[in-house]
């Protein structure tokens, strides 16, 4: 297996792992996961009742088994950006693609965690500061 195949396999594995774990994503009770999932907990249909009286947070409302979490969506944004930039990393393109996915009206539908929300805020603030500086420089 060459280096490109290893990278492709790692990315594919990350997408599969994200989708396989969605049913118990953010359920922090390993005994409960064992009770509900048994020997094959992967690709469990997300169910809010699984989280009742357990440590964790149900964040998969509207999702079905095999869907991606917001982490999978973030990987998709990164790969789409790399593809659109011919394999080159362009942080400005990635930031734009990230905002198009996760900001209000974006294509991602689902739970937005604090890190994603904070990233959106920092990108907006940075863009506002850049625009303000450009306007001041222009005179």
Feature names for model-found ranges:
Residues 1-139:
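Structured, active/binding-site neighborhoods that engage oxygen-rich ligands
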């Amino acid at each position: 297996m060459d280096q490109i195949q290893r990278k492709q396999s790692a990315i594919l594995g990350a997408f599969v792992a994200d989708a396989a774990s969605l049913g118990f994503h953010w359920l922090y009770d390993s005994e409960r996961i064992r009770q509900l999932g048994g020997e094959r907990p992967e690709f469990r249909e997300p169910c809010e009742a699984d989280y009742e009286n357990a440590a964790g947070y149900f964040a998969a409302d509207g999702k079905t088994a095999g869907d991606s979490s917001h982490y999978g969506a973030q990987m998709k944004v990164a790969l789409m950006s790399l593809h659109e930039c011919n394999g080159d990393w362009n942080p400005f393109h990635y930031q734009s693609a990230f905002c198009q996915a996760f900001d209000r009206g974006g294509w991602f539908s689902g739970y937005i965690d604090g890190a994603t929300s904070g990233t959106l805020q920092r990108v907006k603030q940075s863009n506002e500061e850049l625009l303000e500086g450009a306007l001041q420089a222009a005179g």
